[in-house]
C-alpha cells in the first residue's frame, strides 16, 4: 500500500484528488437515488390473482386483486397472497437498489458512504 493512500490506490495519497472523487461519487449516488425513486417494481402471485406495484421509495403504489380470489370463507388465503406479493415487490426494489449501489461503490470499504 502506498504511503498515505488507500488499498487499491483509491486516492493515491492525494487528499485533493480524494475529495474530488468523493464529491463525484456523492453526486452519482444522489442521481442514482433519484432515478430509483421514480422506478416502479411489480410482482404478481397466485397465478396473477394478486399483483402489487411499489416505488423505488419502497411505497406501495397499487394492489390489484382479481374478484375470483375473494372468498369470504377463506380470507386468510387472500391475506397471505397480498402479504407475499407486497414482500416480493419490496424485495425487487431492494435488490435493484443494492445492485446499483454495489456497482457505484464496488470495492470501497464498508461504511465509507
From Swiss-Prot:
Gene3D superfamilies: Nucleoid-associated protein YbaB-like domain. Residues 1-31 are annotated as: Disordered. Signal peptide: none annotated. GO terms for molecular function: DNA binding. Residues 1-14 have a biased composition (Gly residues). InterPro entries: YbaB-like_sf (IPR036894), YbaB/EbfC (IPR004401). It is found in: Cytoplasm, Nucleoid. Keywords: Cytoplasm, DNA-binding. GO terms for cellular component: bacterial nucleoid; cytosol. Pfam families: YbaB_DNA_bd. The keyword DNA repair does not apply. Binds to DNA and alters its conformation. May be involved in regulation of gene expression, nucleoid organization and DNA protection. Belongs to the YbaB/EbfC family. Homodimer. This is Nucleoid-associated protein CLL_A3446. It comes from Clostridium botulinum (strain Eklund 17B / Type B). The lineage of its organism: Bacteria, Bacillati, Bacillota, Clostridia, Eubacteriales.
Amino acid at each position: 500500500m502506498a504511503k498515505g493512500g488507500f488499498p487499491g490506490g483509491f486516492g493515491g495519497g492525494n487528499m485533493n484528488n480524494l475529495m474530488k472523487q468523493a464529491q463525484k461519487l456523492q453526486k452519482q449516488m444522489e442521481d442514482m437515488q433519484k432515478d430509483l425513486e421514480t422506478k416502479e417494481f411489480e410482482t404478481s402471485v397466485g397465478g396473477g390473482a394478486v399483483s402489487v406495484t411499489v416505488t423505488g421509495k419502497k411505497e406501495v403504489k397499487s394492489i390489484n386483486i382479481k374478484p375470483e380470489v375473494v372468498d369470504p370463507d377463506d380470507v386468510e388465503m387472500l391475506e397471505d397472497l397480498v402479504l407475499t406479493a407486497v414482500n416480493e415487490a419490496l424485495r425487487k426494489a431492494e435488490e435493484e437498489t443494492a445492485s446499483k449501489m454495489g456497482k457505484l461503490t464496488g470495492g470501497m470499504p464498508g461504511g465509507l458512504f
